[in-house]
UniProtKB/Swiss-Prot annotation:
Residues bound to GTP: Q11, E69, S138, G142, T143, G144, N204, N226
Known partners and oligomeric status: Dimer of alpha and beta chains. A typical microtubule is a hollow water-filled tube with an outer diameter of 25 nm and an inner diameter of 15 nM. Alpha-beta heterodimers associate head-to-tail to form protofilaments running lengthwise along the microtubule wall with the beta-tubulin subunit facing the microtubule plus end conferring a structural polarity. Microtubules usually have 13 protofilaments but different protofilament numbers can be found in some organisms and specialized cells.
Family: Belongs to the tubulin family.
Places the protein is found: Cytoplasm, Cytoskeleton
This protein's name: Tubulin beta chain
SMART domains: Tubulin (SM00864), Tubulin_C (SM00865)
């Protein structure tokens, strides 16, 4: 019941995805060959959210892996859990997208997309009651951004009533991997605004900061960053996979977090994050978790929630704890920091409690917030985009693949609209509505 189909695209998506499957296999007690070696019946009760059970009793992830070059796929295949995936579900080209969104979306990616969709259909038909799709990709490259958004829009056409959740890695403010990131990211956001239901916004710089500051790692690797992301990914869906007192699923999350359809870009966080050395001294209590979870330093994207206001937020707790205490802490947070929540959405924090904590912890929590400060991310990308687009720098790579400058202009204005919508709701107050009604009344009186 309630299956989720996982799709990973491009180098970044495949590396995050590989780490994610390590975490989920660990939680469900499944070893690298797909056999169950766990100890608790709860691990198997709803294992079918993420796994198919094959005839020989092996568990096979409902995962589709795609890329336009074979490199990353090969390393996933030779990695610790490489043998667990269905071999047919690796779909890859040979040419690569060369960090070019147009190649991923219109030329190279478009040639490969049908074989990816075949695999997606096959997996979807295996599902009893498909809840939705989760897509891992980055927005800075070519495949994850270009082909990723192409796949999302195709799936949207075919399964319009299923949830579409993305874990999107945005270009970082200070660290740039490629020059054309702002182009690729803007073109992708243009697609995500229209076709995705929920986007979890991540970026490497914020993740590096968490590794430096909180985890005290001197030289964090991408593996460390991806581990943080996968902890959050597993937290978002833990309620579907394990019994809980207050359940949430992808659709409940969306209903509670999205006040206006276009504003579905969320900040995510995870607690407890402790450095390896100091773990044993740390008392895990609900107040501790809550405090760290709402901490600005804990957000996995480079936007500071203190610069905006929360429209809505959701806290997912895992472990044995009293629901009363969870509710008290949530109310407490809202009362103490009331200026950081919009007052025209009362009770805008949803909490859920799942009984089974992640491996190695007694309790944990995942935070998902819809904050207007996320506009900082878009604004930054937009400034970089404009600087290059004004000079038409690097455009020939895109027009050469058949794109039109008009598309760039559209994407740019769509992103700027998004920024101003966030700004508008950040400034809105509860009593404005009343003023408009008075004006309407006066207008009628004049008539």
């Amino acid at each position: 019941m309630r299956e989720i189909l996982h799709i990973q695209g491009g180098q970044c998506g495949n590396q995050i995805g590989a780490k994610f499957w390590e975490v989920v296999c660990d939680e469900h007690g499944i070893d690298p060959t797909g056999r169950y070696t766990g100890t608790s019946d709860l691990q198997l009760e709803r294992v079918n959210v993420y796994y198919n059970e094959a005839s020989c009793g092996r568990f096979v992830p409902r995962a589709v892996l795609m890329d336009l070059e074979p490199g990353t796929m090969d390393s996933v295949r030779t990695g610790p859990y490489g043998q667990i995936f269905r071999p047919d579900n690796f779909v890859f080209g040979q040419s690569g997208a060369g960090n070019n969104w147009a190649k991923g979306h219109y030329t190279e990616g478009a040639e490969l997309i049908d074989s990816v969709l075949d695999v997606v259909r096959k997996e979807a038909e295996n599902c009893d009651c498909l809840q939705g799709f989760q897509v891992c990709h980055s927005l800075g490259g070519g495949t994850g951004s270009g082909m990723g958004t192409l796949l999302i829009s195709k799936i949207r056409e075919e399964y319009p009533d299923r949830m579409m959740l993305t874990f999107s890695v945005f270009p970082s403010p200070k660290v740039s991997d490629t020059v054309v990131e702002p182009y690729n990211a803007t073109l992708s956001v243009h697609q995500l605004v229209e076709n995705a239901d929920e986007c979890m916004v991540l970026d490497n710089e914020a993740l590096y900061d968490i590794c430096f500051r909180t985890l005290k790692l001197t030289t964090p690797s991408f593996g460390d960053l991806n581990h943080l992301i996968s902890a959050t990914m597993s937290g978002v869906t833990c309620c579907l996979r394990f019994p809980g007192q207050l359940n949430s699923d992808l659709r409940k999350l969306a209903v509670n977090l999205i006040p206006f359809p276009r504003l579905h870009f969320f900040m995510v966080g995870f607690a407890p994050l402790t450095s390896r050395g100091s773990q044993q001294y740390r008392a895990l209590t609900v107040p501790e978790l809550t405090q760290q979870m709402w901490d600005a330093k804990n957000m996995m994207c480079a936007a500071d929630p203190r610069h905006g206001r929360y429209l809505t937020a959701s806290a997912m707790f895992r472990g044995k704890m009293s629901t009363k205490e969870v509710d008290e802490q949530m109310i407490n947070v809202q009362n103490k920091n009331s200026s950081y929540f919009v007052e025209w959405i009362p009770n805008n924090v949803k909490s859920s409690v799942c009984d089974i904590p992640p491996t190695g912890l007694s309790m944990a929590s995942t935070f998902v917030g819809n904050s207007t400060s996320i506009q900082e991310m878009f604004r930054r990308v937009s400034e970089q985009f404009t600087a290059m687009f004004r000079r038409k720098a690097f455009l020939h790579w895109y027009t050469g693949e058949g794109m039109d400058e008009m598309e760039f202009t559209e994407a740019e204005s769509n992103m700027n609209d998004l920024v101003s919508e966030y700004q508008q709701y950040q400034d809105a107050t509860a009593d404005e509505e009343g003023e408009y009604e008075d004006e309407d009344q006066e207008a009628e009186d004049d008539m």
